A protein has these predicted regions:
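A conserved glycine-rich beta-strand in the N-terminal activation segment of trypsin-fold
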Residues: 15-24
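Alpha-helical scaffold segments that flank or form the walls of functional sites
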Residues: 50-52, 59, 69-121, 143-159, ...
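Divalent metal-dependent hydrolysis catalytic cores, especially in the metallo-beta-lactamase
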Residues: 62, 78-107, 120-133, 160-171, ...
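Active-site gating loops and adjacent loop-to-helix segments of metal-dependent hydrolytic enzymes
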Residues: 82-93, 133-160, 203-244, 284-309
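Conserved, mostly hydrophobic/aromatic
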Residues: 127, 182, 212, 322, ...
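Active-site core of metal-dependent hydrolases
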Residues: 158-283
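His/Asp/Glu-enriched, well-ordered alpha-helical/loop segment
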Residues: 229-247, 263-275, 280-364
Length: 383
């Protein structure tokens, strides 16, 4: 079946195409062209002068739609994925927080099942923890933190092909060996919830850590100890060109000035947007059942300490917020699609509107609200 999207402004790696068309054949893009003449046998979709852009790639989300991926059930996965799909995340890497070995194994089984399904937006699993510094880990991780255990992490990795990213604190004993092992398996080793100083960050990068989770959050910046000043993890990451970063652009975790600064210094090629959302993304939640979490000021906080523990944002909200912060739309779209696809190793299929890639496509109005969306050529209902 052919579908031809016409009468829109198409965003491609080469720039914008006016008065062109995107042609979908089944689950893939047949062509992106500067011609909008109707194709014989194709169903025409009129974009009404709106933006036609790549589907967003969500590489860090703990849940949505009222469910948490760490529940590790098929029902929870499907509910959370459906919520993010409606907000433009046509590719998703579900995040499982620190949990028991058996629970993670159950989550792996669910992830493998969904990845095998035709049309699934799931491209792999993201594990955050348990190898995190307790001094920087938020309340949501509870008592499930540990130092890297080669027997445990090798058993998990060798049991599946679905683990695509794993977060850890590089200053922990055994963390550098952990990163080197992940790198050898093609898994993105990520710095997270850390107190690492410059030399530790440099050593981490050389060992295999290439990405930083929720940049600025869960890590120290420039600080003073007695009369002397020291760099933190943040400045160390800025100094190492090869490290990529992610920003929670929900309007709560980081101010506009920092969103602009980080994306300017690291560059579009090294910066991506993530929700780091908890179960309450995509739902109108005011009160929550979790005894440890409250929603206040549009963000998830620890009920006891009021520390930020996650967002309620979706990918479309991040894009809108970045543009409001003054970042050019073209850069923002790349940070929501192209860059995360490249970081996660799926740019051959995802992240841009190009021939033979998956037909993951969004139509946005001038306020960057999603008006129509396709995931692998299938129109997403309920938008």
């Amino acid at each position: 079946m052919l579908t031809q999207i016409i009468n829109g402004k198409i965003f491609t790696p080469q720039g914008w195409i006016e008065d062109g068309s995107v042609v979908i054949r089944d689950s893939h893009i047949l062509e992106v062209t500067n011609c909008d003449l109707p194709l014989t046998g194709a169903k025409q979709v009129d974009a009404r002068g709106r933006y036609i852009v790549p589907g967003y790639v969500c590489m860090h989300a703990h849940g949505g739609g009222g469910r948490d991926f760490t529940e590790c059930t098929e029902e929870a996965f499907r509910s959370a994925i459906a919520a993010h799909l409606k907000h433009g995340a046509t590719t998703i890497f579900p995040t499982i927080s620190s949990s028991s070995y058996d629970n993670v194994k159950q989550g792996i089984a669910v992830c493998e099942q969904l990845m095998a399904e035709k049309g699934s937006p799931v491209m792999g699993l993201h594990l955050e923890g348990p190898y995190l510094n307790p001094k920087r880990a938020s309340d949501q991780f509870g008592d499930k933190l540990a130092e890297p255990d080669p027997a445990a992490y090798k058993a998990l990795v060798e049991s599946t092909d679905c683990i695509k990213r794993w977060d850890a604190s590089p200053e922990l004993p055994g963390a550098l060996e952990f990163a080197a092992y992940l790198k050898s398996k093609g898994i993105v080793a990520t710095i997270s919830h850390t107190e690492a100083e410059y030399q530790e960050v440099k050593d981490a990068y050389e060992a295999g850590f290439t990405h930083v989770s929720h940049f600025y959050n869960g890590m120290p910046g420039f600080h003073k100890c007695r009369e002397y000043k020291y760099e933190g993890t943040v400045e160390s990451v800025y100094l190492i060109d090869g490290i990529t970063i992610e920003l929670i652009a929900d309007g709560r975790h980081l101010p506009d000035t920092i969103l602009k600064l980080a994306s300017k210094v690291k560059g579009v090629e090294k910066t991506c947007l993530v929700t780091a959302s908890l179960a309450y993304a995509g739902v109108d939640a005011k009160d929550v059942d979790d005894p440890n979490i409250i929603i206040e000021d549009g963000v998830c906080k620890s009920r006891e300490t009021k520390q930020l523990v996650g967002s309620v944002a979706t990918m479309d909200v991040l894009v809108q917020n970045m543009v409001k912060a003054g970042v050019p739309l073209e850069d923002v779209l790349r940070m929501a699609s192209e860059t995360p696809a490249k970081i996660m190793g799926v740019y051959d299929k995802k992240g841009s509107l190009e021939k033979d890639k998956d037909a993951d496509i969004l139509i946005l109005d001038k306020k960057l609200r999603i008006r129509s969306a396709w995931s692998k050529g299938q129109m997403i209902e309920g938008i």
